[in-house]
Structure formats: C-alpha cells, structure tokens
Amino acid sequence: MIISVASSAACLYSDNKQAVLFFWPEVKFPAFMSKSMMRCLKLKKLFELRNAVLMSVLVGSYVISGGTTAFAEEMKTFNLDEMIVTATATPVDKVKTAASVYVITSKEIEDKQYQNLYEALQSVPGMNSRLYGNGVGYELSGYSVPSLRDKYAVVLIDGVNQAMDSKARNSLIDINPRDIDRIEVLKGSASVLYGSNAIGGVINVITKRADSGVQSAIKYSVGNFGYQSYNINNRGSEGNVYWSVNLERRNAGDYEDGSGVNHPTDKKNNIANVKFGYKANDKMDFIVKYDSSHQDMKWSELYKKSGVVANHDGEFNIDNITLISDFVDKKNGEGNNFYVFKGNMKAVRNYHHNPDKELDDGSYTFKDSGETYKVKAFRIADRYYKQINDEHRILIGAEHYDYKDVYLEGKNKIKENSVFLQDEWNFAKNFKLTSGVRYVVPGDFAGKYITSFNLGYNPADNLGLYIARNEYYVQPSMGQVFGTYLYNPNPDIKPTSGNTLELGVNYQIDNTSFLNANIYRREEDNSISWVKEGTKRKYVNVDGTAQNNGLELAYEKQFDENWKTKLSYFRTWSNKSGKQSFLPKDIVSINIDYSKGKTDVGLFGLGKYNLYGKSQLYYDSLPTDSFWVVNAYANYKPTKDIKIFARINNLFDKDYSNAGNWFKLKDGSIDAIDYSDEGRNFMVGVEYSF
C-alpha cells in the first residue's frame, strides 16, 4: 500500500470521459467534474516530486519502526470535520495543542447574529481587523485583511485557502451562520503548513457536513441607517448526496458616527453560497462549492479641514468555485485532502473629488478619476497523511497558486510552487515534537526552505506547555512588483522573510474554566514600505530587522448552566522600522453570555488603546486613539421553529475610528479624512425554520 501510494501521481487524467484520481483507482469522479479538474495535469511534475519524497519518508519510517502501523487511539484521524487548526494540523485535545488557538462556536455566531468575518473576529486576542468607516468601498484595502499580531492572516474555508493575492486578501466578506460549525483561529506564523502568506496566523471557517433530512429557514432583519436583510437557506441530505444553499439580499444606507456627523453611504449586496457533496463510500467525499457576492456601492470621504465631501461609487464582485475530494481511512490511519480553487474578483471604483485640492507632490489630483481591479486566482493543493506507528505520524503535501490582474499592463501574473513535509513524534510519554519543512519557489524569486518546530509538554492531564518557532517567506504582491495607478513598479523588490518564536501555556483550571497565556517575538527582514518617486510612490524593502513582541491572555469560565464569560488581553511592543504600526498597543475584550430556556442575551465589550502611537492621532484623522465599544444582543424562541432576535452595536454611541488617513496639500497644510465608525445602531429580525 505504501509503495503504491507513494509512486502514484496526485493528478487527474481522462479515461472514457471519466476522471480518475490516481491515489484511489477504484474511485471515479462524476463525469461533469472531469473538464473542470483537468488543469491539474500541468502540475504533474510538482506532485510527482511530492510523491517521490513521500515514498522515501514512508519506507524509511516503516523500516525504522519495524513494520508497526498501529494507530494511536489518543490521536484522532485528520479530517475536516474534526480538524482543529494548529501549528501541527492535528486534531488534539485543547490542553495538548502546542499553539495559541481561539475557537468561535456555531452557537456564538448564530446567537450574536454576526454578518461578516469582521464582526465575528473582534473578540480574538491579537486580532485587529480594521475598516474604513463601515467598510463600504474599501473591500480591497489592506484594512479589509484580517490582521493577527500586526500581520495579515490566511482565511480558509474547510481548509481551502481563499487568498486572492500574496497579501492574503480574501473573499470571505460575508458568512452564512447556519452553515458554519465553528471558526478556529491559530495565532502565529504557520507558513509551513498553510502557505507562505500565513504570517500572522490562520483563520479556518469549518462548515457543517450532511444533516439528516431537509431543513429550511427564512430570515428577515431591519435596522437603522438603512439596513435590511432578506435571507433564505436550505440544507440537508438524501442518500449519498448532501447540500447547502444560501441566498441573501443586504442593503445599507447613510450612517451617523458617534458625534452625529452624517456619512453618505449606499450598499446593495446580493450573496449566494451553494455547496453540493457526494459520499462515494464511507471513506471518500466529493464536494463542489460556489460562492458569490455582487455589490453596488456608494461611499464618501469627509475632509475635516476643508469640509469637502468627496462622493464615490462603484461595484465589488466575487465569484469563486471550489472542488474538493476528501479521503479518510480511520482504520489504517490514512487520508488525503485534495482541492482546486478558482476565484474571480472585480472592483470598479469611480472617484469624484474637488478639483481645487491636490497633493503636495502632485502625485494625485483631486478630480474625477477611476480604477478597475480584476484578479483571477487559481490554487491547487494536495495533502496526504499516514499514521506510521504509535509514536509517528507524517503529513506531506504540495501546492501551486497563481494570481493574475487582467488590467495591469505588461507582466501581470505572480505564481508560487511549494512542497512540504511534517512529522509528529510522541516521545517520553508526555512530550510531542512536531517539525516541518516547506520548499517555496515564489515565481521569479529564488527558492527557499522554511522550517517549523513545535514542542509540547504535558506534565499533567490539565496542563500543556509549549515552545514554537516558525519561519515564513512571502513574495511581494502584484501591486508592489508591477505598480498601480498610484505606485511605480519595482522589479527589484525582494520577498519578505522572518520567524516567530512563541512560548505558551494551556491550562484547564477545572471543569468550568480554561486559560491560555503566551508571549511571542517576531523578527522580519526585507519588510516592505513605500517612498516618493517623482509624481508617484514606489514600494521598497526596508533596511534592518523589524521586531514585534507581544503578550496574550485568554480566559473562559462557565459559571453554571446559564452564565459564561470570555476575557482576553493583548499587549504589543515593537521596533517597527520605516513603517507606522497600525496595531494598538493594548486590546481588551469581554464577553458575557446568559442562556436559559427560550432566551439568550449577552454583552460584548472591546477596548483599544494607543492606536497610532506618537503620530498626532495620525494627523488628527482619528476622534481618539483609545476607546471602548459595547455591543448587546438578545434572542427569544417562542416556539422551536421561530426565533426573534435583536442586536445593538455601539451601545453608548462612542465616536471612534479604527482607521485614519490624511493628505498633504500644496500649501503645506494637512487635511485629515474622517473615517469614523457607525454610532449607535440596531438590528431586529425574525427567523422561521421548517
């Protein structure tokens, strides 16, 4: 079995109009999938290399272990239903996880009526997802990328990387709460297992698998600031087929910030999430997914000094298709996950400015202008694991991606190939060492090996100590290499490399409380910033090593069957070189939840302190550099089929902003832009299930 698996190629071929996966010759894909998946033939050499490495590792491990292939009962089988996203990619007990992992459950998502990833991630320690205002019009901004420890994080859906470029910009703008089992957040570099752009960490949205029977739901909600949402959802299974279909229309209008200033905004968003699965046998699943979000939008920029209101409009569209094959053999401790992801993202932004305003360097005139940004992303990845014996488990894989901006002139494509290997070794009863290596070939740049080491020690069943060191190596984005309408190209820019060292503890205090504490240090070379060049700017590498240090505490307590709380604290300090840090020095979050019978209520408080350091509140574009925001929610189920819900955001009508910007005018003065977030706002709705 080992030799036959290792010598086979992880690719597809056409045979009598049916595609066959070489790893499992007895399993055939449905005919309609053949054409879509034939592209992986181009990557045959990459996967053959992976399999050659796999054969040597497996045979060597088999000989060393004396041919023992017993499956360790305490180590659960790797599959998407049970996987906890950690630095080891192994489903383990929370105490034994040699990493800092934060879990958001499906109940939390549904009870608190989260509408997007930004809302759901606010309570995660070290998370700093920032938006310009309410986010409309800035879906492509770096602020839209979830940030962990001041570095962007990779977003996965069922293990599938959703990145649309090397800066990890992703298309997970909206989520369907009914389809999510949990969201697991791994903090710290995880590039060896999850790709070179997993610098800050990994956010894995794990969806539910097949439910017995058929379930449907319709939901309507309405609020101030023009908010409306119409949603219909259907999911279930019949025989070997299972599915989930979600359709939603969401509208939003002008909003007022906490000081009463009106911000002209308009959003009309159509969302569709469709998933079909086929269970070929008790070991193999095939899944096809389509995710779409089409948005027409208008937004504004308010200039504080001049009083100018610049009104803009545009559209933002996402269309993604994902194909997955998931093989799990629990009896033999073996499995394989293979996926193909094809994403299309288009943004059209039309700017309408005051023609009398102009930047000091002449790089941008405040007049009517526009830009179109269209990216085609393709990613194919394969991951195979094998339980060798009670002590050893290996995981090996290969990945290819390419991103293409169809509107860039000249060379407009970046790509990356990589192979990776990981070994999990249990030794001396209470120790576990997980080590890995990935060889990355980022397009035209030199290839590089990056490594990871996670050592866990469990002196007691309720206590886990760990130390981890993980490296990363990520190539510049398309805009940094090829330029944009504001930036000149820089073909000489270099990839960024670095490492994160972390020490932590996971402590199950008793049956009702849990504590995670960790400290980390990240060092980075060839960080990327920008300088002026003529009438434009240019991205360049920063000299010296940038260092970021942090401390995180997360505490959970279930007081009784009704009351529970989550508390977290994050502190960071750094010597950022040549670049302004946008990570607050201190972030505090408090969750208090109460559930009894038909009622669920709760409060969430988020405090951020010293957002921009000593930068004069980023030239006065922020109302304050420190703030507390409190949200509240309530749900009531008069019957098992009906749920009435309400949510209030910014309960105390705080005037605050997560992002700032400014422009230097020709007369030398500074005009700051007001990106204040929404003031007190509410949402009420009803959901009917049948």
Per-region residue spans from a language model:
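Extracytoplasmic beta-strand/coil segments of soluble accessory domains associated
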Residues: 93, 118, 122-160
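Surface-exposed extracellular loop regions of Gram-negative outer-membrane beta-barrel proteins
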Residues: 296, 303-304, 409-411, 443-448, ...
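Conserved C-terminal beta-signal and adjacent last beta-strands/turns
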Residues: 40, 46-55, 59, 71, ...
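N-terminal periplasmic accessory domains that precede
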Residues: 117-120, 141-146, 171-176, 185, ...
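Outer-membrane beta-barrel signature, preferentially recognizing the C-terminal barrel domain
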Residues: 73, 305-330, 373, 464, ...
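Short acidic/polar hinge/loop motifs at secondary-structure boundaries
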Residues: 160-187
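Gram-negative outer-membrane beta-barrel transporters
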Residues: 426-432, 520-523, 542-616, 643, ...
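Periplasmic-side early beta-strands and strand-to-turn transitions of outer-membrane beta-barrels
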Residues: 204, 212-213, 221, 233-316, ...
